[in-house]
């Protein structure tokens, strides 16, 4: 393995990334954030995502006992058509983006994160992700479904109750679009899947 500065090629994106292993020897090892509180309650009456509580948008959660899915009250994307106003400047071109943003509460428990759940509960969450992906993909304007989880305030998570988000978007996001194109090019050139080749190399 290289021990000095070098650029490494990312075959999924076609980009070169600077790698500087020698910087691991410097005395500063990065910002250290405080660990989240260890003794969270199983139910928090002030939590927007706990069962029976009122959400920030005014709706009240049901008394759910497994996963709970709802459209995000403060969605980054909206499903209604709302064409972008034309801008007569080549450097300021907007493109309207439709989408659906949903929240998936893993369980009613405020204090249990995904790795702390039992296998059957995790399987139930995965089945919910699959069902949501199928449902969103069936909408005529949805071209891409992304499932993700933000962990901690530093990553933009506004609520500690364990949950993920699912976005169904009208267009393929930049990173997945690049990855798709490079995987197509690899298959066309070699007749094999890029990720399978990478796994075999590992």
Please identify what each model-predicted range represents.
Residues 1-202:
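HIT superfamily nucleotide-processing domains
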